[in-house]
Amino acid sequence: MHLVATHGHFDHNFGNDTIYKEFGLKPEIHRKDERLLQTIGDQAMTIVGANIDAEMPAADRLLSENDTIEFGSHKFVVIETPGHSPGGVFYYCKEENVAFSGDTLFKGSIGRTDFVGGSMFMLIQSLRMISQMPDEVKLLPGHGPETSIGEEVAHNPYIDR
């Protein structure tokens, strides 16, 4: 079992303490977002005024481009997609033609870049790279409905080829 994070923002990680207590799993996250894991409470207070008083586990594994994570017979490759956060990633399984896209790319939109460490320049570079993936790749974003590379290239105003 794995606890993987597409990036280090609080809304994707504030349950890490419970998962660690229940299952002994610590998050696996890109090395450039490790510091964000240490500021989950501060992020929640700044962004939504929520007080998260929990001891979050440190990262178990720091990921980089082309690292792999195996779930049974499925192998997911880490694809760096910085912009929404410095260490944003896709987890891509070529055999299943699916990618977990986190907050980099949504159906009809993209992730915000106004949080600490965000960069519109980096996000645009990531989107240019992502647009070269096969059209059939199903995307499972961190928020909202699923979509595909082809659907986003055809209809999302932020991504093209």
Annotate each language-model stretch with its function.
Residues 1-68, 154-158:
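Active-site HxH/HxHxD metal-binding segment of metal-dependent hydrolases
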Residues 42-46, 68, 74-161:
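Metallo-beta-lactamase
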